[in-house]
């Protein structure tokens, strides 16, 4: 068991070192204006790509990622039913869903998420 772990750790470390050395040794490409410009479906960009975008859009994107992560954390719960007592699993699931619901209610009530002013 321990020799397998040491062997796999050695192999992954060697591969990581080889990739790091290859990235350092291989030449970098020349950066020209075309490579550094944003691509917009073959059209010339109308505005600068470095303009700030709406903070509300950023907030909605972050909230979407948080809810997506919370839903992804719910997926292993059916597999955990074989590992723990069913009552414990139900309590954990209910607590997790309560946190998810509380976050949804907070975001629903929170004024920064309203688009119309």
From Swiss-Prot:
Membrane-crossing ranges are 6-26, 57-77, 89-109
**How does this chain sit within the bilayer?**
Multi-pass membrane protein
Q: Which reaction does it catalyse?
A: a ubiquinone + NADH + 5 H(+)(in) = a ubiquinol + NAD(+) + 4 H(+)(out)
Q: Where in the cell is it found?
A: Mitochondrion membrane
Q: Which GO terms describe its cellular component?
A: mitochondrial membrane; NADH dehydrogenase complex
Provide this UniProt record's keywords sorted from A to Z: Electron transport, Membrane, Mitochondrion, NAD, Respiratory chain, Translocase, Transmembrane, Transmembrane helix, Transport, Ubiquinone
Enzyme Commission identifier(s): 7.1.1.2
GO molecular function terms attached to this record = NADH dehydrogenase (ubiquinone) activity
PANTHER family cross-referenced by the UniProt entry: NADH-UBIQUINONE OXIDOREDUCTASE CHAIN 3
What's this protein's function? Core subunit of the mitochondrial membrane respiratory chain NADH dehydrogenase (Complex I) that is believed to belong to the minimal assembly required for catalysis. Complex I functions in the transfer of electrons from NADH to the respiratory chain. The immediate electron acceptor for the enzyme is believed to be ubiquinone.
- Which family does this protein fall into? Belongs to the complex I subunit 3 family.
* The protein, known as: NADH-ubiquinone oxidoreductase chain 3
What organism is recorded for this protein? Paracentrotus lividus (Common sea urchin)
